[in-house]
Every structure is written in C-alpha cells, then in structure tokens.
C-alpha cells in the first residue's frame, strides 16, 4: 500500500475519522 494519500483520499478520510484511524493502523 502507498502511504502517501491524494487530496481526495485525505478528504474522504477526514470525513470518516474512525475509519481513517483504522486505515492508518493498517498502514503502519
């Protein structure tokens, strides 16, 4: 997985904060 996120991806993650934290844990 590419750790770098596009602007659109960042916006989507900011909307679903709980999901974003889970995704970031998976990326680590």
Swiss-Prot record:
InterPro entries: 14-3-3_dom_sf. It comes from the Eukaryota. SUPFAM superfamilies: 14-3-3 protein. Belongs to the 14-3-3 family. This is 14-3-3-like protein 4.
């Amino acid at each position: 997985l590419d750790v770098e996120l596009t602007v659109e991806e960042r916006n989507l993650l900011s909307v679903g904060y709980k999901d974003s934290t889970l995704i970031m844990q998976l990326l680590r």
